[in-house]
Curated annotation (Swiss-Prot):
GO MF annotations, alphabetized: GTP binding; GTPase activity; metal ion binding
Domain TrmE-type G per the UniProt entry, residue ranges: 214-375
Names of the cofactor(s): K(+)
Family statement drawn from the similarity comment of this UniProt entry: Belongs to the TRAFAC class TrmE-Era-EngA-EngB-Septin-like GTPase superfamily. TrmE GTPase family.
Role noted for this protein: Exhibits a very high intrinsic GTPase hydrolysis rate. Involved in the addition of a carboxymethylaminomethyl (cmnm) group at the wobble position (U34) of certain tRNAs, forming tRNA-cmnm(5)s(2)U34.
Annotated transmembrane regions: none
Comment on bound cofactor: Binds 1 potassium ion per subunit.
Name of encoding gene: mnmE
Protein name, entry field: tRNA modification GTPase MnmE
Organism taxonomic ancestry: Bacteria, Pseudomonadati, Pseudomonadota, Gammaproteobacteria, Pasteurellales
Source species, domain of life: Bacteria
Binding site for Mg(2+): 228, 249
GO BP: any one term: tRNA wobble uridine modification
Length: 452
């Protein structure tokens, strides 16, 4: 017999309302034992919740959803009572005294919904993304994914790939036909259409991934260059202590903001120099740990101390230690003191921005540059939200399509084209969960809240 699961659906702790969710074949039995009544599906009942001996534990609203018309596709019971944690724990213990009921694993309700075809894998992930959204744009985009906008685009691509694959395999199976199906141009035209449509979905998915993941920007530089002042200017508040004493910042400071909806994780680090102080050495090592893991490095220079053209020589060792292809922007700070004109220029292959973190002159230029460098495009409408695994799958599918195009146009190798199309179909289907591994499912649902 299939197991019945139960969990608290509201956050742990004190609140106005607390909800317990039960899903599985014993949901009706739970209702009968706790409420003493058979519930009418989809109708709110205001009833007392009783203990084993009939003592009232709480009173609230009970809702019953009959399979398959529920979130999980199973019988579901929701008990909505007062949000005191002691009350909820007592009610949970009471439910667990019924044989055949256990505590749900993290994400198990959503997993059951996926397994019962109530939603696909991309939609299930969107539930977690909607809960974790840190901006209005991210929330709206996650909701679009939950409603199936991303999945629909993927399913349309898969359908076209299946159609083309069928056509190619038919051409292979009937080689004696008078028409050369591989050379008549129809397959290539259809293949090109799929390639172009996939490129459009990849671009939209990239925007969705930026909206979800954001950018990790690390501010690096010598002591007293103005790193903490820049952190405060970008954050719009006094997040870091600022003094004229070099080495004030000895640890890593994190600040999370949004640039037109794009999450930006700004990290202020200890000044980079030869240090004899053991505490400062630890701070510098932590700074390097953040620098090598960054999406973007902001190298902060004091414009009153050195020429703009001297940075490659002065910072040659620093630049050599950066990971290959690490995006780096040179910040010439304190232009209010040096007299330099604020703005963005290109210098020796680097983007250089002149600004004053203290007066905030030129800080808006930096904000726009950070958005542009990530390829983020602000939009009031927004698209769907995407994860890194989605981007990887789309990239892999694009490579197989490109390889398939080569097999068709250069070698007229129908069998190899058909194989590439099969791989495209499987790769795209991993996004929605039509073709996926149990390990992937476990990794995805284990990141959910326990009551979801």
């Amino acid at each position: 017999m299939k197991e019945t699961i139960v969990a608290q659906a509201t956050p742990i702790g004190r609140g106005g309302v607390g909800i317990l969710r039960v899903s599985g074949p014993l949901a009706q039995q739970v209702a009968q034992e706790i409420l003493g009544k058979t519930l009418t599906p989809r109708l709110a009942h205001y009833l007392p919740f009783k203990d084993n001996d009939g003592e009232i534990l709480d009173q609230g609203i009970a809702l019953f959803f009959k399979a398959p018309n529920s979130f999980t596709g199973e019988d579901v019971l929701e008990l909505q009572g007062h949000g005191g944690q002691v009350i909820l724990d007592l009610l949970l213990k009471r439910i667990l005294t019924i044989n055949g009921i256990r505590i749900a694993r993290t994400g198990e309700f959503s997993e059951q919904a996926f397994l019962n075809d109530k939603l696909d894998l991309a939609q299930a992930e969107a539930i977690a993304d909607l809960i974790d959204a840190t901006s209005e744009q991210a929330a709206r985009s996650a909701l679009k994914s939950l409603q199936g906008e991303f999945s629909n685009k993927i399913n349309q691509l898969v359908d076209q790939v299946i159609y083309l694959r069928t056509y190619v395999e038919a051409a292979i199976d009937f080689p004696d036909e008078e028409i050369d199906f591989l050379a008549d141009g129809k397959i290539e035209r259809h293949l090109n259409d799929i390639i172009h449509q996939l490129a459009a979905v990849r671009q939209e998915a990239k925007q969705g991934s930026i909206l979800r993941e954001g950018m990790k920007a690390v501010i690096a530089g010598r002591p007293n260059a103005g790193k903490s002042s820049l952190l405060n200017a970008l954050a719009g508040r006094e997040a870091a202590i600022v003094t004229n004493i070099a080495g004030t910042t000895r640890d890593v400071l994190h600040e999370h903001i949004h640039l037109d909806g794009m999450p930006l994780h700004i990290i202020d680090t200890a000044g980079l120099r030869e240090a004899s102080d053991e505490v400062e050495k630890i701070g510098i090592q932590r700074a390097w740990n953040e620098i090598v893991a960054a999406d973007h490095v902001l190298l902060m220079l004091d414009s009153t101390e050195q020429s703009a053209y001297a940075f490659k020589t002065e910072w040659a060792e620093f630049l050599a230690k950066l990971p290959p292809k690490m995006p780096i922007t040179i910040i010439r700070n304190k232009v209010d003191l040096s007299g330099e004109v604020e703005g963005l220029t290109q210098l020796d292959g680097f983007t250089l921005i002149r600004l004053s973190a203290q007066t905030k002159i030129g800080v808006d230029v930096l904000r726009e540059h950070l958005k542009t460098s990530m390829g983020y495009q602000s939009s009031t409408e927004g698209g769907f939200l995407a994860r890194r695994r989605h981007l990887q799958a789309l990239e892999t599918a694009a490579k197989h399509l490109t390889q398939g195009h080569i097999q068709l146009t250069q070698f007229f190798a129908g069998e190899l084209l058909a194989e590439e199309l099969r791989l495209v179909q499987n790769t795209l289907s991993e996004i929605t969960g039509q073709f996926t591994s149990d390990d992937l499912l476990g990794n995805i649902f284990s990141s959910f809240c326990i009551g979801k």
